[in-house]
C-alpha cells in the first residue's frame, strides 16, 4: 500500500525516545494493555462485547476443542447386514468372494468397507472378515449360520 507520509524516524535520529515521551513508554507490552489475551475480562471488555459471541464470549473464553491428527482418525465406510445379504450372490458370480463348506466368505476390506452394521435381515450363511462389527450384526449373522471374524486395519 502507498504510504502518503514520510516516516518520522528519519527526523528523530538522536532523540532517544522518538516522540514517545519518557523512556520505556513505547517498550514491551505496557502501553498496549498487556500481552496476548490479558485484560479481556477487565479493561479490554469492550473488545469481547464487540467481537465475541453473545453469551459465550467465544473465541475469547472457553474451550476451543481438539482436532485429531489424520493418522489417528478412521473414515468409516459401513455396510448393513441386509445390504450384504442382497449382494452376496452377485459378488460370488463376479468372483469377488468365495464359498467354503456351504458358507460364503466375505472380506469387507477387499470390498471397500470397514464396518458391519446390523440393519436389515440376513438368511444366507456367511463368514465375514471385518475390522469392526456391531453387536446386532454379529447376532444376526450367527442366527443365519455364519460367523464374524475381526481383523486389524492396516493403515
From Swiss-Prot:
Keywords: Ribonucleoprotein, Ribosomal protein, RNA-binding, rRNA-binding. The keyword Coiled coil does not apply. Pfam families: Ribosomal_L27A. Residues 1-16 have a biased composition (Basic residues). GO terms for biological process: translation. Residues 1-35 are annotated as: Disordered. InterPro entries: Rbsml_uL15_N (IPR027386), Ribosomal_uL15 (IPR030878), Ribosomal_uL15/eL18 (IPR021131), Ribosomal_uL15/eL18_sf (IPR036227), Ribosomal_uL15_CS (IPR001196). GO terms for molecular function: rRNA binding; structural constituent of ribosome. SUPFAM superfamilies: Ribosomal proteins L15p and L18e (SSF52080). Coiled coil: none annotated. GO terms for cellular component: cytosolic large ribosomal subunit. Belongs to the universal ribosomal protein uL15 family. Binds to the 23S rRNA. Part of the 50S ribosomal subunit. This is Large ribosomal subunit protein uL15. The lineage of its organism: Archaea, Thermoproteota, Thermoprotei, Thermoproteales, Thermoproteaceae.
